[in-house]
């Protein structure tokens, strides 16, 4: 086959793949987000879709939702409520039900992966506990979660639900500001943390590169770039371009107060060894071999 013909064939194949084997995207139901909730012992699933028939300018959405005994059944029924063929290739957000545990995350993550693999841009949150109306709230929930990602330099990909066998860690949406963080252990209780502790957990999990949070009892806000390195069980927290913004007529040593709170948050996060959320056991075993005693994790804070 000549080179021009080969290029033409590849172009045709790519076009068919992108448009769904001959069906244009404009004729398909484009899924942007999937939300799950549990209500009265049953699952509820909501598909947020691009409304391609909307007459107004800008991005418009529509929803399809259903209830089922399982998450898979609820999602299948929501899909069946739509007249067109679904396209998951642009799916970039999924919300797990509030209060979910590790088993829920694995089940729902597998279901989503089957729909949208490999889904490199798909972000995962845990939904808040508010009683949402899918038709009224789904679009604003989607926009809010994407805004949180941008503002806080936050990203938890679908693949991060499966990187460890003993647990996973997922940001949790909150309607006011910032985000909470869910630590879901396979063989232990799920732990939800908030504020500075949540953002430290996200940094330790490699899901954020920024702290932007109140501290010192709400007296000030810290905005800083953050990077994490480790030597055995000693974690180095590198803070760059740090800015402290007092929220009143206070004159404090903000750096010292932040360091104190970070140390307290780190101690609390590493006290429970139900799962190796921050890979400290993993790196220690790689250095010293299986069976070696794990030293108490230590945090070094470096302002740069």
State each model region's role:
Residues 14-15:
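Residue-level signal for mature regions of secreted extracellular proteins and peptides
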Residues 2, 8-9, 18-304:
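Membrane-proximal alpha-helical signals and transmembrane carboxylates
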């Amino acid at each position: 086959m000549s080179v021009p013909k080969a290029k033409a064939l590849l172009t045709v194949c790519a076009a068919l793949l992108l448009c769904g084997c001959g069906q244009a995207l404009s004729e398909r139901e484009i899924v942007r987000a999937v939300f799950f909730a549990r209500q009265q012992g049953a699952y509820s699933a909501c598909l947020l879709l691009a409304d391609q028939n909307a007459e107004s300018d800008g991005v418009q959405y529509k929803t399809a939702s259903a209830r089922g005994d399982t998450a898979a059944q609820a999602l299948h029924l929501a899909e069946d409520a739509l007249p067109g063929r679904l396209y998951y290739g642009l799916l970039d957000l999924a919300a797990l039900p509030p209060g979910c545990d590790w088993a829920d995350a694995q089940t729902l993550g597998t279901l989503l992966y089957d729909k949208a693999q490999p889904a490199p841009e798909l972000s995962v949150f845990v939904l808040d506990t508010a009683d949402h109306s899918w038709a009224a709230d789904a679009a604003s929930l989607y926009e809010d979660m994407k805004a949180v990602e941008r503002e806080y330099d936050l990203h938890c990909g679908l693949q991060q639900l499966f990187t460890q066998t003993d647990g996973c860690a997922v940001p949790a949406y909150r309607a006011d500001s910032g985000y909470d963080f869910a630590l879901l252990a396979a063989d232990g209780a799920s732990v939800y943390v908030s504020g500075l502790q949540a953002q430290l957990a996200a940094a330790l999990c490699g899901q954020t590169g920024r702290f932007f949070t109140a501290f010192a009892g709400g007296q000030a806000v810290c905005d800083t770039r953050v990077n994490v390195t480790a030597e055995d069980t000693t974690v180095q927290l590198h803070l760059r371009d740090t800015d402290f913004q007092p929220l009143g007529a206070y004159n404090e040593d903000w750096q010292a107060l932040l360091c104190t709170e970070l140390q307290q948050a780190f101690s609390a996060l590493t006290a429970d060894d139900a799962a190796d959320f921050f890979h400290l056991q993993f790196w220690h075993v790689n250095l010293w071999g299986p069976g070696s005693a794990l030293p108490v994790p230590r945090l070094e804070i470096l302002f740069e």
